[in-house]
C-alpha cells in the first residue's frame, strides 16, 4: 500500500504512474465501454455529430451512436449493412488540410496511433472500412456529406475514397478530387493505397 504526503501528491502519482500502466488502461477501457452499453454515461453530442445524425435521419438510415466494438466505440454503426461512420474532429483527429505534421501538439501526436490502431482493428476483425466525415465538411458542406453517406450506405460500403475531404460537388454531384490526401493515421502505412 502506498502512503502519500497529501491528496495532491496522491493524485499526481496516480495520473503520472498508475493510470499509465497497460493493465490499468485495458481494464478502464472495458469499464467505460460497459458503462456506455448500459447507458450509464451521458451521451453529449458535438455539433458535427449532431449534423451526422441529422443526415442519417434524413436519409432514413437506421444507426446506433457510440456502438462498442470490444476495445473501441464507433460514432455511428449502420447495423443493417454492418457499416461505420466516424465523425472526425479537425483538431483531435488532425485534419491534414488544416494541420501540418510539423505543427502538431502533443495531444494530436498521441491521437494519431490510436486512430491508426482503431482503423486497423475494425478492418481486420470486422471487415469494415469506415467512412470518415470530417468536422470542416460537416459544418461547411453538409450536403456533400449527405451524398457521400448515401453512396456509402447504398453501395454496401464501397467507395473510391473514405474521407470526406477528398470530395467536392460538381454540378450538384459528388465528385472525387484529382489529388487524394491521406489522414495522418494512414500516412506511412501499407493500407494507405487500399483504404485511403
Predicted regions and their residues:
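Cys/His-enriched microdomains
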Residues: 3
Amino acid at each position: 500500500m502506498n502512503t502519500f504526503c497529501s491528496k495532491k501528491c496522491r493524485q499526481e502519482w496516480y495520473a503520472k504512474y498508475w493510470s499509465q500502466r497497460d493493465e490499468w488502461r485495458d481494464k478502464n477501457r472495458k469499464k467505460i465501454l460497459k458503462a456506455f452499453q448500459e447507458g450509464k454515461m451521458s451521451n453529449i453530442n458535438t455539433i458535427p455529430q449532431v449534423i451526422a445524425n441529422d443526415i442519417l435521419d434524413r436519409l432514413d438510415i437506421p444507426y446506433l451512436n457510440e456502438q462498442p466494438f470490444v476495445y473501441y466505440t464507433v460514432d455511428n454503426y449502420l447495423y443493417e449493412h454492418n457499416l461505420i461512420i466516424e465523425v472526425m474532429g479537425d483538431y483531435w483527429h488532425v485534419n491534414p488540410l488544416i494541420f501540418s505534421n510539423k505543427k502538431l501538439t502533443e495531444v494530436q501526436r498521441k491521437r494519431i496511433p490510436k486512430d491508426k490502431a482503431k482503423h486497423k482493428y475494425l478492418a481486420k476483425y470486422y471487415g469494415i472500412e469506415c467512412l470518415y466525415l470530417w468536422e470542416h465538411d460537416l459544418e461547411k458542406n453538409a450536403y456533400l456529406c449527405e451524398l457521400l453517406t448515401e453512396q456509402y450506405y447504398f453501395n454496401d460500403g464501397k467507395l473510391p475514397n473514405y474521407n470526406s475531404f477528398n470530395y467536392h460537388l460538381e454540378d450538384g454531384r459528388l465528385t472525387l478530387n484529382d489529388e487524394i490526401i491521406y489522414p495522418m493515421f494512414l500516412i506511412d502505412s501499407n493500407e494507405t493505397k487500399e483504404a485511403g
